[in-house]
From Swiss-Prot:
GO terms for molecular function: structural constituent of ribosome. The keyword Amino-acid biosynthesis does not apply. It comes from the Bacteria. This is Large ribosomal subunit protein uL29. One of its GO terms (biological process) is translation.
Length: 67
C-alpha cells in the first residue's frame, strides 16, 4: 500500500494496519527461522509498510501535512 493511500485512512485504521503488519512480520520471521519462507522479499515489504504507517502516525502527531 502506498503512502498516499495510507494517508487517506483514519487513525484507528492506521493503528489496525500497524498491528496487523507487526503480527504478519512475526509470522514471517518464524517461517524464516524454520526454513518455510517461500518469498524472503515479503519480509522487506512488511518492514517498509510498518515504517510507512509509523511515519504517517508521527506526521499527524506533529501536525505535518504532506502533499
Amino acid at each position: 500500500m502506498k503512502a498516499k493511500e495510507l494517508r487517506e485512512l483514519t487513525d484507528a485504521e492506521l493503528n489496525k494496519k500497524l498491528s496487523d503488519s507487526k503480527e504478519e512480520l512475526f509470522k514471517l520471521r518464524f517461517q524464516l527461522a524454520t526454513g518455510q519462507l517461500d518469498n524472503p522479499m515479503k519480509l522487506q515489504e512488511v518492514r517498509r509498510r510498518i515504517a510507512r504507517v509509523k511515519t504517517i502516525i508521527r506526521e499527524r502527531e506533529l501536525g505535518i501535512r504532506r502533499a
